[in-house]
């Protein structure tokens, strides 16, 4: 089955290239970005301003192809793509939880940028701690992996070849 998804807008961020960009929003919690919704979707923003955090789903538009096994940024051995947050995914969908700063008309201002400028925005969901926070979590191969912020940036391992 094939299907298509229509973007609801796009992201404006300071990052133009995959190399050296943050790999998670928490790495650059103070970095600022904008989610610009197309005007026909702006009414859907009603009441979103009551949330401190939102989940952005977007297309990893500068990534081509995919790999079912990758050496992720936080390890030096291969793992299955679905056990990582690496960008070389079959459907190239990115997800970030960001801090909502304010909404003006059809523009959401947020902090915690880990996506590329121009990324097509696919969906927005409110982060709701009652639903989204979990206890008794297992972290798989990531258990105990804590890297200093300067190491939490991408390199060239997922560049298009």
Name the predicted role of every residue range.
Residues 1-95, 102-161:
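Cys-His-centered catalytic/binding microenvironment captured across papain-like cysteine peptidases
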């Amino acid at each position: 089955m094939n299907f298509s998804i229509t973007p609801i807008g796009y992201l404006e961020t300071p990052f133009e290239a995959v190399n050296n960009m943050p790999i998670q929003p928490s790495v650059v919690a103070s970095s600022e970005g904008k989610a610009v919704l197309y005007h026909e979707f702006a009414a859907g923003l009603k009441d979103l301003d009551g949330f401190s955090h939102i989940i952005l789903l977007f297309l990893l538009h500068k990534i081509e192809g995919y790999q079912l096994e990758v050496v992720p940024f936080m390890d030096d051995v291969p793992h299955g793509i679905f056990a990582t947050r690496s960008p070389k995914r079959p459907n190239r969908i990115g997800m970030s939880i960001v801090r909502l700063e304010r909404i003006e008309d059809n523009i959401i201002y947020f902090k915690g940028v880990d996506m590329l400028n121009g990324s097509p925005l696919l969906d927005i969901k409110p982060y709701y701690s009652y639903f989204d926070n979990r206890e008794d979590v297992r972290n798989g191969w990531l258990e105990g992996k804590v890297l200093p912020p300067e190491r939490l940036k991408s390199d060239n391992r997922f560049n298009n070849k």
